[in-house]
């Protein structure tokens, strides 16, 4: 039996808890990836990946909202993001979702989710396919075991009908899907691309090796190195251009992170 701890708290508390259990959820990653994409500045994300627990399960979305407390300050102790950055992050989510997340968050809904924003991750990014694929690429190329929530796998949009029915803010990201809805979702180019990205990640032997992260201005690089292979995810957060390069048995490969490039590889 293994213990996987689910706790929303100050980031240093999370680090300490990780030393005392088998695994923890990385709840700091979702807001940090959003902040990087919104601002074009991945420095806070790079800093976190330098110190984050390696015995973690990474997420971008879950059955709950997008946590904010995990990157915020605690009293006079600074957080991974400052108050102004957090305010900007939350407002950008509300703007990208055309106000839908505002309707589902805090006093607007029956549950007072003051520490999280209720919204699908896809809508938090304004349903921007390229930004969404980059977010997932960062998640699955970071240390830990990546967990992809079912609504995230299908790039689901906010379920405003369910929210109106229940008035439970978190239900905005808890869609009921029948067989037809799943089949239709699997035909979406962004979903095909995401599945191809996951398959690529799972095929790379380097990802059981040593991890390092480098950042220069708007460029973030996630590097993996093992005895016989290497892999690197490079993301330009200013231009939203990303790629994976990897070598196995001395052969170099390059894959662009884009809907067209990845979606085509599903049937290749």
Language-model segments: which ranges?
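Active-site and adjacent substrate-binding regions of carbohydrate-active enzymes
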Residues: 1-268
């Amino acid at each position: 039996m293994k213990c996987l701890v689910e706790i929303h708290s100050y980031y240093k508390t999370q680090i300490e808890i990780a030393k005392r259990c088998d695994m923890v959820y990385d709840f700091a990653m979702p807001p940090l990836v959003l902040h990087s994409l919104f601002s074009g500045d991945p420095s806070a994300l790079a800093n976190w990946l330098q110190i984050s627990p390696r015995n973690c399960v990474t997420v971008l979305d879950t059955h709950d909202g997008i946590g904010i407390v995990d990157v915020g300050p605690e009293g006079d102790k600074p957080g991974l993001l400052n108050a102004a950055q957090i305010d900007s992050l939350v407002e950008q989510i509300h703007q990208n979702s055309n106000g839908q997340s505002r309707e589902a968050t805090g006093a607007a809904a029956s549950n007072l989710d003051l520490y999280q924003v209720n919204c699908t991750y896809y809508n938090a990014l304004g349903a921007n396919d390229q930004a969404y694929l980059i977010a997932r690429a960062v998640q699955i190329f970071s240390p830990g075991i990546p967990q992809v929530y079912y609504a995230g796998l299908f790039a689901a949009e906010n379920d405003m009908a369910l929210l109106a029915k229940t008035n439970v803010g978190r239900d905005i990201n808890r869609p009921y899907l029948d067989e037809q809805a799943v089949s239709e979702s699997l035909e979406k180019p962004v979903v095909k691309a995401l599945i191809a990205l996951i398959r690529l990640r799972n095929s790379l032997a380097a990802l059981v090796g040593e991890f390092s992260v480098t950042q220069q201005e708007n460029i973030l690089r996630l590097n993996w190195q093992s005895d016989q292979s290497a892999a690197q995810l490079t993301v330009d957060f200013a231009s939203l251009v990303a790629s994976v390069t990897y070598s196995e048995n001395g052969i170099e490969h390059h894959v662009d992170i884009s809907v067209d490039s990845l979606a085509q590889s599903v049937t290749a």
